Amino acid sequence: MDSKLRSLLSDHSRYVESFRLFLQNSTEHQCMQHFIESKLPNIISSIGNDKPVIDVLGVGSGSGEIDLQMIAKIQARWPGVPINNQIVEPSAEQIFGYKERVAKAPNLENVTFSWHRQTSSEFESQVNEDKQMRKFDFIHMIQMLYYVKDVLGTLKFFKSCLAPSGKLLIILVSGNSGWATLWKKYGQRLPLNDLCLYITAGDIAEMLSSMGARFQSHELQSDMDITECFIEGDRDGELLLDFLTETCDFKRNAPADLRDQIICDLKSPGCSTTKDGKVIFNNNLSVIVVEAD
């Protein structure tokens, strides 16, 4: 890694700004919403059988937009059954946004919310210290496994937190996405450190197979307009480049050869397509659903 390059996560406000821009320019949340509408009801169809309370755990839930859509599907499947929704999220800013969202949302009378301002590893340590293994009927980890130090250990721990008939839902970038192309080629030169791992759903599937876990995978088609990345001096384009490389102020700080190579490769068929004069990045995702033992 070039010594001048810093992880985007080291500048929280710039990370949040670039992440919001990513959501604005991509179909990330739309493709997740389509999955929740079309596939999630079947996935959760038996998690609450004979349960007086349904226990849900969100790990790295952000501001809760996707969480509340999934909660609505659980409510639709088991009307009136109390839902205990625990949230593990390290960002105070995101928790504040989540609480604001809950305050405005209708039809949450039977849902209790508990927020834990922790990383997933801090939550794991606390559970192990308390020696009281909580069991959950539904656990979801959406776009967060990049930020844990021990991915295999994290998978084993949260799988062990599943109640009988429980499901663990993981969403990550697909192994056939532009992200995978970018990370395989440039991961060694980008700020790969304690803050971020360059992993895809393909890596997770291999780990789950090595554990002997039962799981299914679903591919979600998603794209992102990155045209602004190629406009000189465009601030939004620079923020999107930061997000794509997980690097703070990439355009200014990256060595010229690395910057030029990545900008060139972002236009290549392995990363993007060109349509109506726009450069559209392959943001495909994979959903992995892990079964309880």
Curated annotation (Swiss-Prot):
The keyword Iron-sulfur does not apply. It comes from Xenopus laevis. Its EC number is 2.1.1.8. PROSITE patterns: SAM_HNMT (PS51597). Monomer. One of its GO terms (molecular function) is histamine N-methyltransferase activity. The keyword Transferase applies. It holds the Pfam family Methyltransf_23. InterPro entries: HHMT-like, SAM-dependent_MTases_sf. GO terms for biological process: histamine catabolic process; methylation. The lineage of its organism: Eukaryota, Metazoa, Chordata, Craniata, Vertebrata. S-adenosyl-L-methionine binds at residues 60, 89, 94, 120, 142. Keywords: Cytoplasm, Methyltransferase, S-adenosyl-L-methionine, Transferase. It is an enzyme of class 2 (transferase). It catalyses: histamine + S-adenosyl-L-methionine = N(tau)-methylhistamine + S-adenosyl-L-homocysteine + H(+). Belongs to the class I-like SAM-binding methyltransferase superfamily. HNMT family. It is found in: Cytoplasm. CDD domains: AdoMet_MTases. Inactivates histamine by N-methylation. Plays an important role in degrading histamine and in regulating the airway response to histamine. This is Histamine N-methyltransferase A. Transmembrane segments: none annotated.
